[in-house]
UniProtKB/Swiss-Prot annotation:
GO terms for molecular function: cAMP response element binding protein binding; transcription coactivator activity. InterPro entries: TORC, TORC_C, TORC_M, TORC_N. This is CREB-regulated transcription coactivator 1. The keyword RNA-binding does not apply. One of its GO terms (biological process) is memory. Transcriptional coactivator for CREB1 which activates transcription through both consensus and variant cAMP response element (CRE) sites. Acts as a coactivator, in the SIK/TORC signaling pathway, being active when dephosphorylated and acts independently of CREB1 'Ser-133' phosphorylation. Enhances the interaction of CREB1 with TAF4. Regulates the expression of specific CREB-activated genes such as the steroidogenic gene, StAR. Potent coactivator of PGC1alpha and inducer of mitochondrial biogenesis in muscle cells. Its main location: cytoplasm. It is found in: Cytoplasm; Nucleus. Residues 151-167, 292-301, 310-331, 414-426, 450-475 have a biased composition (Polar residues). GO terms for cellular component: cytoplasm; dendrite; glutamatergic synapse; neuronal cell body; nucleus; postsynaptic density.
Length: 630
């Protein structure tokens, strides 16, 4: 038994022993793991400590520039020397231990800088040390160079920068943080350029762009800092520059300022007299267009429009610029103004969109305009759904905008005769926009509309006269395009969108909306906006340039006639565009895009708009729809 039992006992003992060993080994491994982790953490700490230890000296080790700017350069030098000496000792020591490897590092260290080696030796990992050193070294030089640049522009910055560095004291971190501050400062600087002047100077962006915080007054200068900043800073200047096309970058905001100036002159705006309508249009950005659309005779009246000559001229210029250049380039207000007369020609494009008298009612427009009293003047013959949002108010001669919803071609005859028509010119007054959406090419002159549209009107309509079509497209683009985009890049986007949209026949409605813009019709901005007239649209495009002026964009409304979209569609589109342009124009504040939060139109939205049965009798209803659907 003993012999037999012995092996068993031994085997058991062995098993127990093995088990214990395994357990111990596992425990040992765990401990080792913990140790290694701790060591790694310690190394990390050391590295960070090293970086932070010499933020002053570490930062400037590699950079001579930092030393130049540094007040405590002497201390820096001392630190340098110390590392030097220690580095010599360390090097010898390291060489003993590490031999060849250390030699290589030593060589490198000599080439680069002794400071590294001491650090690396202390850390027991040259590579690790060199890494932190490298970061420190790299960041300080960049930082210093930056500081130097800033210091050149602003002496006090160097003083400020050291302070910042001290506060941040963190090697590379310090530099980065400084930069961050600088970046942030510019924005603040624009907001309170005077107060933050010092800070802005500190900021490196601030220096170059922000160094002129005061010049922020000039919207153009503000552009550099940032779109948002520019808007904030430029807003005030923008008000002054409402007439100018350049400041329009912040057009979205400018329009509101402009409308205010225009309103006083546009009080007749409600009157819708040609001048009044011009004023209102200008105010809405439609006026300019309206004038542009009006026959040549109307264009002169347009100028007289109550709207300040500036606003009119801006509109006119804008119209012209838009009409003439297919690109919808916003011509300088002056050019547009000059074009105003030419606009009659240019208007032909718009005219194409709006049959002047004939536009009154292209036969296709079956529905008599609802009773927009002023608007309906001409329109009665062709039944049209007056889109007059607030028809009642001269402000909203949407009635003038009336377009037969059923008409696929959005025939909108805005009786230029409205108050405008008298001023406009006989015969021409019924410049109702008759947009034969379907026949984008042939613009319906409408029975009533003699060539008054403009000789080119039919052709221009078909051709979407270069100026008009791009403009219109741009208008459409703005409609479909983000209203917000329009605000910021309205003009450019509008152009691009307009081109794209032009390609889409679905844009007809936009055309119709533009056609809705009746030069004669005193499409007040609100009307245009409510109608979503492309004119208002065009205004959006140009709002930047003429947003305040009244958009003069109406010419932009120039049809992109894809005559298929029914008036209702164009109505929706117009309203959408109007909403967008509303953002730009205070006149239509009632439907500001921002408030409506209107998104760019989608194909579904277009179809919805295209629905001929979708007739919104009431302007308010229309607006609601617009808000709900869009």
């Amino acid at each position: 038994m003993a012999t037999s039992n012995n092996p068993r006992k031994f085997s058991e003992k062995i098993a127990l022993h093995n088990q214990k060993q395994a357990e111990e080994t596992a425990a040992f491994e765990e401990v080792m793991k913990d140790l290694s982790l701790t060591r790694a953490a310690r190394l990390q700490l050391q590295k960070s400590q090293y970086l932070q230890l010499g933020p002053s000296r570490g930062q400037y080790y590699g950079g001579s520039l930092p030393n130049v700017n540094q007040i405590g350069s002497s201390s820096m030098d001392l630190s340098f020397q110390t590392p030097f000496q220690s580095s010599g000792l360390d090097t010898s020591r390291t060489t003993r231990h590490h031999g060849l490897v250390d030699r290589v590092y030593r060589e490198r260290g000599r080439l680069g800088s002794p400071h590294r080696r001491p650090l690396s030796v202390d850390k027991h990992g040259r590579q690790a040390d060199s890494c932190p050193y490298g970061t420190v070294y790299l960041s300080p030089p960049a930082d210093t160079s930056w500081r130097r640049t800033n210091s050149d522009s602003a002496l006090h910055q160097s003083t400020m920068t050291p302070t910042q560095a001290e506060s941040f004291t963190g090697g590379p971190q310090d530099a980065h943080q400084k930069r961050v501050l600088l970046l942030t400062v510019p924005g603040m600087e624009e907001t309170g350029s005077e107060t933050d002047k010092t800070l802005s100077k500190q900021s490196w962006d601030s220096k170059k762009a922000g160094s002129r915080p005061k010049s922020c007054e000039v919207p153009g200068i503000n552009i550099f800092p940032s779109a948002d900043q520019e808007n904030t800073a430029a807003l005030i200047p923008a008000t002054h520059n409402t007439g100018g096309s350049l400041p329009d970058l912040s057009t979205i905001h400018f329009p509101s300022p402009l409308p205010t100036p225009l309103d006083p002159e546009e009080p007749p705006f409600p009157a819708l007299t040609s001048s009044g309508s011009t004023g209102s249009l200008a105010h809405l950005g439609v006026g300019g267009t309206g004038q542009g659309m009006n026959t040549p005779s109307s264009s002169p009246q347009r100028r007289p429009a109550v709207v300040s000559p500036l606003s009119l001229s801006t509109e006119a210029r804008r119209q012209q610029a838009q009409q003439v250049p297919p690109t919808l380039s916003p011509l300088s207000p002056i050019t547009q103004a000059v074009a105003m007369d030419a606009l009659s020609l240019e208007q032909q494009l718009p005219y194409a969109f709006f049959t002047q008298a004939g536009s009154q009612q292209p036969p296709p427009q079956p529905q008599p305009p609802p009773p927009p009293p002023p608007v309906s003047q001409q329109q009665p013959p062709p039944p049209q759904v007056s889109v007059g949002l607030p028809q009642g108010g001269p402000l909203l001669p949407s009635a003038s905008l009336t377009r037969g919803p059923q008409l696929p071609p959005l025939a909108v005859t805005v009786p230029s005769t409205l108050p405008q028509s008298p001023t406009e010119s006989p015969g021409q007054p019924p410049m109702g926009i008759d947009v034969t959406s379907a026949p984008a090419l042939q613009y319906r002159t409408g029975a009533g509309s003699p060539a008054t549209q403009s000789p080119t009107s039919p052709v221009s309509n078909q051709g979407f006269s270069p100026g008009s079509s791009p403009q219109h497209t741009s208008t459409l683009g703005s409609v479909f395009g983000d209203a917000y985009y329009e605000q910021q890049m309205t003009a450019r986007q509008a152009n691009a969108l307009s081109r794209q949209l032009e390609q889409f026949n679905m844009m007809e409605n936009a055309i119709s909306s533009s056609s809705l813009y009746n030069p004669g019709s005193t499409l007040n901005y609100s009307q245009a906006a409510m109608m979503g007239l492309s004119g208002s649209h065009g205004g959006l495009q140009d709002p930047q340039q003429l947003g305040y002026a009244g958009h003069g964009g109406i010419p932009n409304i120039i049809l992109t006639v894809t005559g298929e979209s029914p008036p209702s569609l164009s109505k929706e589109l117009s309203s959408t565009l109007a909403g967008v342009s509303d953002v730009s124009f205070d006149s239509d504040h009632q439907f500001p895009l921002d408030e409506l939060k209107i998104d760019p139109l989608t194909l579904d939205g277009l179809h919805m708009l295209n629905d001929p049965d979708m007739v919104l009798a009431d302007p308010a209803t229309e607006d609601t729809f617009r808000m709900d659907r869009l």
